[in-house]
Amino acid sequence: MAPSPQQDAILTLDGVVAGYGKMTILNGVSATIRRGAITTVIGPNGAGKSTLFKTVFGLLGVRTGRVTFDGADTTSFEPRRMLDAGVSYVPQGRNLFPELSVRHNLELGGVALSDTSRLAGRMDEMMARFPMLRDKANAQASTLSGGQQKLLEVARGLLLEPKLTLIDEPSIGLSPLMVQEVFSILKDLRSAGVSILMIEQNARQALAISDYGLVLEQGQTRIEDTAQNILADPRIAQLFLGGGLAPATSETSR
């Protein structure tokens, strides 16, 4: 069941403009990401989805507009400050050190923890939550399957107990069975109180486990609604077939 409209926001974007060099990718994105929910961002290639995540996490500067996380203005925050504030980021693709062990790769997610006892405790918690990582703790990361590597990246992102996790295309290169496992873990994280903002190419499957959805096109928010309503919107089928979205109506766009 989707959270109520009164549920408070953990992240808001207000007219955010960002890009690379002279190229503008995000052209006034506004959105509200609800606390304790899974929100999936979809849209055609080049819509600005990954750029949105990089901007929220502080990897890319905001030219104009405002980003607010958990009630604080984080528009100018760099990645380390976003980590400290409670945001983790799992980028697209493989982002592990293949020659290091599973345990060492996981420990790298806790570089911001100065308390070694707390780090040890969080490591134990992650090993318990992800039994596969415990069983392969001393194996090189390069020996893991694609799905296992993705689970390791997710676990590493959770080591600092984030309030919000940004996950970019978690299903890329995974078998259908492993995709189901990853999505099941995301649902468990939501139940544990972690807010999740996800980009996913398998939009229908992702929206099926999501509470909310956000459709981007040409660097702008075109639809922001419950996942259920987006799944039922006939314009989404046109988007998936490669066409643009028709002008949004007041019933499904806000």
Predicted regions and their residues:
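ABC ATPase C-loop
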Residues: 157-158
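ABC-type ATPase nucleotide-binding domains, specifically the catalytic core motifs of the NBD
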Residues: 21, 39, 61, 102-121, ...
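Conserved ABC ATPase signature
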Residues: 140-144
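Conserved ABC transporter NBD signature motif
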Residues: 65-73, 85, 119-123, 225
